Amino acid sequence: MIEDFHLTPLSANADAADLLEALGPLDDSPAESQYCVFRSGRERFCLPVLDVEEVLDWPLLTKVPLAPPYLLGIFNLRGVIVPLIDIALTEGRRPGLLPKHVVVASLRGEAGHDDLRVGIAADEVIGTYSVTTEDLLEQAPENVPHCIGMLRHEDRLALLIDLRKLLEVYPGPSI
């Protein structure tokens, strides 16, 4: 509300220390980050929302000959070819059961390089959530090399995906 807004006039020769003093004490509450939480197979995973480009319904896929089993195919996303991987394959997804959604994630390219996009098969997109750093656990199971931690969410844990590691573990086709 406008009543909550308070201006403190500063003199013309005020410096940075005067400005900080006028602002008052800084908020010491834990920093919050937003994550997209989704289920793939039996496990919940999450990505920072800044890494998620969009969530799609299941697209029309083109199979890639001689592709590894985790590479479900490629699809066209507004003129960009995106590989679609199934990270639940290692957990024994039931044969013939296709996921319903695709979480399209983007790994920002370094200077002079394009962004890398990858689609991750998701059975359910649970939502986006703001969490504090207290809700993040630094340890991930050692047998999940593409995860760098875990997020506490609704009394359950979601594995935090590192896109760089994910693309090392599940390399897509060279296009």
Segments and roles (model prediction):
Residues 1-175:
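An acidic, low-aromatic, low-complexity terminal/linker signal
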